[in-house]
UniProtKB/Swiss-Prot annotation:
This is KH homology domain-containing protein 1. Belongs to the KHDC1 family. GO terms for molecular function: RNA binding. The gene is KHDC1. The keyword Metal-binding does not apply. It comes from the Eukaryota. Keywords: Membrane, RNA-binding, Transmembrane, Transmembrane helix. GO terms for cellular component: cytoplasm; membrane.
Length: 237
C-alpha cells in the first residue's frame, strides 16, 4: 500500500513509530503533491475512525437507525460524483487544471483572504491550490484537481464570472453562490456541461490565462466549453 501511495503521488514517505498508538510521517516531494498526500491520509484516517466508532456503537447495542442515518450522511458527502470517494481514484490527479487569474478576480471568487476556498473545495469535490503573485504582473496561479466534470464545472464558472457579457457574468455569480452554499449534485454538473458554449468572447483573455488540461476520452482536448480566452496544452510535456 505504501509503495502504491508513493507511485500515485510521486512523493517519498518516511514513517517512524513514536508511541504504541501513533506514528510520525515525513513526506518529501513537490509541495502541492505533499498537500494532496496529507489530505488523503487525513481523510482516510477520519473515515476509519468513524467506521470504528460506528462498529463499536453497534456492538454496544445502539440503535441501527441512528447508525444508518450517519452512514447515509457520510455517503452523500463522499459519493456524490462516483461510487467511490473521488480522492481514491488515481485518474482524478493525473492532469491538474492550471491557469493564471488576476488578483481582484481571485478575491471576487474566493473572498478576502481566500475565505471561501475551503467550502468551494468541499462543495465541488476538488482540491484547489492558490499561489499569489506567481507571475511578474501579480497574477495568481490556480491549480485544480478532481473529477473531470467537477473541474469542467469550475472552469465554466470561472469563465462566466470573468466575462464582460452581463448575461454570462450574472450566470457565473449564480454558480459561484451555489458552490459556496451547498455541495454540487450530478444534476448541477450535467446542466453545466449541457449549456451551449459561448464562443468569441475574448474578454477573458486579460482576466484568466494559462494552461488548462482536462484529460478525458474525447476527440480533441480543445472541446472545453467557454474557454476562448484560455490557452490549452498538456501540463506535462
Amino acid at each position: 500500500m505504501l509503495s502504491a501511495f508513493q507511485r500515485l503521488f510521486r512523493v517519498l514517505f518516511v514513517i517512524e513509530t513514536v508511541s504504541e498508538y501513533g506514528v510520525l510521517i515525513f513526506i518529501y516531494g513537490w509541495p502541492f503533491l505533499q498537500t494532496l498526500a496529507m489530505l488523503l491520509i487525513g481523510t482516510v484516517s477520519f473515515h476509519l475512525w468513524i467506521r470504528r466508532n460506528r462498529e463499536r456503537n453497534s456492538r454496544s447495542g445502539k440503535t441501527r437507525c441512528r447508525s444508518k442515518r450517519s452512514e447515509q450522511s457520510m455517503d452523500m458527502g463522499t459519493s456524490a460524483l462516483s461510487k467511490k470517494p473521488w480522492w481514491t481514484l488515481p485518474q482524478n490527479f493525473h492532469a491538474p487544471m492550471v491557469f493564471h487569474m488576476e488578483e481582484d478576480q481571485e478575491e471576487l471568487i474566493f473572498g478576502h483572504g481566500d475565505t471561501y476556498l475551503r467550502c468551494i473545495e468541499v462543495h465541488s469535490h476538488t482540491l484547489i491550490q492558490l499561489e499569489s503573485w506567481f507571475t511578474a504582473t501579480g497574477q495568481t496561479r490556480v491549480t485544480v484537481v478532481g473529477p473531470h466534470r467537477a473541474r469542467q464545472w469550475l472552469l465554466h464558472m470561472f469563465c462566466c464570472v470573468g466575462s464582460q457579457d452581463s448575461y454570462h457574468h450574472a450566470r457565473g455569480l449564480e454558480m459561484l453562490e451555489r458552490v459556496r452554499s451547498q455541495p454540487l449534485t450530478n444534476d448541477d454538473l450535467v446542466t453545466s456541461i449541457s449549456v451551449p458554449p459561448y464562443t468569441g468572447d475574448l474578454s477573458l483573455a486579460p482576466r484568466i490565462s494559462g494552461t488548462v488540461c482536462l484529460s478525458v476520452p474525447q476527440p480533441s482536448p480543445y472541446q472545453v466549453i467557454g474557454c476562448s480566452g484560455f490557452h490549452l496544452s498538456s501540463l506535462y510535456p
